[in-house]
Regions:
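Active-site-proximal alpha-helix that buttresses catalytic centers in soluble enzyme cores
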Residues: 1-73
C-alpha cells in the first residue's frame, strides 16, 4: 500500500503565512517515509483537488488529509 499525507492549510494572501506552512510541510517530509503534499482550501495553490490528483497520479492507494490551521494570515 502506498500512503500519501496531504497537509491542508486554510490559505492566505500573506506570503509569510504561506512560507511558514510550507516550512512545516518540508519538516514533515523529512520526518516521514511516505510522501507529504501541501494543499490549501482557498487563497493559495495547490488546492485540495489538485493535491489529491497528484497523489493518485503517483500511485497512492491511501490518502490521509490532515487539516492544519495554525498560522496567522
Amino acid at each position: 500500500m502506498s500512503s500519501v499525507l496531504i497537509v491542508l492549510g486554510h490559505g492566505s494572501r500573506n506570503p509569510a503565512a504561506t512560507a511558514q506552512f510550507m516550512e512545516l510541510v518540508e519538516h514533515l517530509r523529512s520526518a516521514r517515509h511516505e510522501p507529504v503534499l501541501p494543499a490549501f482550501m482557498e487563497l493559495a495553490e495547490p488546492g485540495l483537488d489538485a493535491a489529491v490528483e497528484e497523489a493518485v497520479a503517483t500511485g497512492a492507494t491511501e490518502i490521509v488529509v490532515q487539516p492544519c490551521f495554525l498560522f496567522d494570515g
